Swiss-Prot record:
<feature type="domain" description="EF-hand 4">
    <location>
        <begin position="120"/>
        <end position="152"/>
    </location>
</feature>
<comment type="function">
    <text>Calcium-binding protein involved in larval development and metamorphosis. Likely to function as calcium buffers mediating the transport of calcium from the sea water to the blastocoel where calcium is required for skeleton formation.</text>
</comment>
<dbReference type="Pfam" id="PF13499">
    <property type="entry name" value="EF-hand_7"/>
</dbReference>
<feature type="domain" description="EF-hand 3">
    <location>
        <begin position="84"/>
        <end position="119"/>
    </location>
</feature>
<keyword id="KW-0677">Repeat</keyword>
<feature type="binding site">
    <location>
        <position position="99"/>
    </location>
    <ligand>
        <name>Ca(2+) 3</name>
    </ligand>
</feature>
<feature type="binding site">
    <location>
        <position position="25"/>
    </location>
    <ligand>
        <name>Ca(2+) 1</name>
    </ligand>
</feature>
<feature type="binding site">
    <location>
        <position position="61"/>
    </location>
    <ligand>
        <name>Ca(2+) 2</name>
    </ligand>
</feature>
<feature type="binding site">
    <location>
        <position position="97"/>
    </location>
    <ligand>
        <name>Ca(2+) 3</name>
    </ligand>
</feature>
<dbReference type="InterPro" id="IPR002048">
    <property type="entry name" value="EF_hand_dom"/>
</dbReference>
<dbReference type="InterPro" id="IPR011992">
    <property type="entry name" value="EF-hand-dom_pair"/>
</dbReference>
<feature type="binding site">
    <location>
        <position position="139"/>
    </location>
    <ligand>
        <name>Ca(2+) 4</name>
    </ligand>
</feature>
<feature type="binding site">
    <location>
        <position position="101"/>
    </location>
    <ligand>
        <name>Ca(2+) 3</name>
    </ligand>
</feature>
<dbReference type="InterPro" id="IPR050230">
    <property type="entry name" value="CALM/Myosin/TropC-like"/>
</dbReference>
<feature type="region of interest" description="Disordered">
    <location>
        <begin position="95"/>
        <end position="121"/>
    </location>
</feature>
<feature type="binding site">
    <location>
        <position position="27"/>
    </location>
    <ligand>
        <name>Ca(2+) 1</name>
    </ligand>
</feature>
<feature type="domain" description="EF-hand 1">
    <location>
        <begin position="10"/>
        <end position="45"/>
    </location>
</feature>
Length: 152
């Protein structure tokens, strides 16, 4: 299975364990009902329509259920999407880092966020800096920026 090449043996074993936990009727596939119950157990709730969409997005054999290989492929696709987003956010950081020193000064951040429509107010920008500036150096480095983006 092609998706397995993207994961370590330990990751595949963990995914199998989780898959088996979701497959409450032991049919080797996850139904919409099982997926819904799983999400409820994690404190998340989705409509039947949302769950059906999740299944149809990865149900390559159109069985109406998700087997292990389909689940693994779905996870792989999400990882690829996140990688693209991370590259996109890295480029955004580089574009805002006008002096190229690897961190965003309050001025660089203000310039970037003030150009947004509608422009962001100084008070909001200051709050963003305070939230993101983990090492309290008054700037946002690449790692802090990525953590901020992922928390949104």
């Amino acid at each position: 299975m092609a998706a397995q090449l993207l994961f370590t043996d330990e990751e595949v074993t963990e995914f199998k364990r989780r898959f088996k936990n979701k497959d409450t009727d032991k049919s080797k596939s996850i139904t919409a009902e099982e997926l819904g119950e799983f999400f409820k157990s994690t404190g998340k709730s989705y409509t039947d329509k949302q769950i059906d969409k999740m299944i149809s997005d990865v149900d390559t054999d159109e069985s109406g259920t998700i087997d292990f290989s389909e689940m693994l492929m779905g996870i792989a696709e999400q990882m690829v999407k996140w990688t693209w987003k991370e590259e996109h956010y890295t480029k955004a950081f580089d574009d805002m880092d006008k002096d190229g020193n690897g961190s965003l000064s309050p001025q660089e951040l203000r310039e970037a966020l003030s150009a947004s429509k509608p422009p962001m107010k100084r008070k909001k920008i200051k709050a963003i800096i305070q939230k993101a500036d983990a090492n309290k150096d008054g700037k946002i480095d690449r790692e802090e920026f990525m953590k901020l983006i992922k928390s949104c």
